[in-house]
Regions:
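Sec-dependent N-terminal signal peptides
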Residues: 4-13
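Lipid interaction determinants
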Residues: 15-173, 184-237
Length: 237
């Protein structure tokens, strides 16, 4: 009986480790070409963001929380720019993943994503804006109601979203690739929901990590001076 229990515990531990390894394999940025459409799929710290663009044209985005269960990804949407009734919906998506490819079994068929990065970087994670410099003083930002602004960063990709899950409301998003080196944070915009003409633009900021928070300052896309503080969001699962 003792040996049997030890075997069960060993199998349970091994299964738990395999699940964790699979979830870690999902982390990062993935891309899938569907004809002229490009799908971006980001997994980081229990959150997922999925965006579709065609050339410079933004098509749509959705995202929320996820977890791995057996051979499926279980998602719960926080936002959906195309169909707001999809918010709060739970989906179970069968998948397989290797170090370079992610295959998802979706109603339209098999979607084979190629890895862009593995989600490893100093800034990789989910962030929410918590402070802003005003009149020379840093003022805490307390987002009212259920409005939320998130920024997800993988190893090389970023995306921000402005949403209100309680109202199933989507206000905007933008994303692309980024670099963070020698105190300089640079974004290269690849999609932007509010203005396609922003695609191809680059924005550079002075950036630093201080007490776990991310400080960055410079000029916004509209040319206004900004100094923002972003704080990490705890893992969703």
């Amino acid at each position: 009986m003792k040996i049997f229990l030890i075997c069960i515990l060993a199998l349970s531990t091994a299964f738990g480790n395999l699940k964790a390894q699979t979830a870690t394999l999902l982390n990062g940025a993935w891309e899938f070409n569907e004809g002229e459409k490009l799908h971006h799929l980001f997994f980081q710290d229990g959150f997922y963001f999925h965006t579709v663009q065609q050339g410079n044209q933004f098509i749509g985005t959705d995202g929320g929380h996820y977890e791995v269960k057996d051979k499926s990804i279980i998602t719960k949407a926080l936002f959906d720019s195309i169909d707001s009734t999809g918010v709060d919906n739970i989906k179970e998506i069968p998948f397989s993943v290797t170090s370079t490819q992610l295959s998802l079994s979706v109603p339209q068929g098999e979607a084979n994503f190629q890895r862009v990065d593995n989600g490893q970087a100093e800034l990789a994670g989910i962030w929410r804006i918590t402070g802003r410099m005003q009149d020379g003083k840093i003022t805490a930002i307390h987002q009212t109601g259920t409005r939320q602004t998130y920024k997800l960063l993988t190893g090389t990709k970023f995306q921000w979203v402005a949403i209100d899950p309680a109202k199933k409301q989507f206000s905007g998003t933008g994303g692309g690739s980024y670099t963070f080196k020698d105190g300089k944070y640079t974004e290269n915009i690849e999609f932007f929901s509010r203005d396609n003409s922003r695609v191809g633009a680059s924005l550079s900021f002075d950036g630093k990590l201080e007490n776990g928070d991310w400080h960055h300052s410079g000029l916004s896309s509209k040319g206004a001076k900004i100094y923002e503080i972003w704080s990490r969001v705890g893992k969703a699962n």
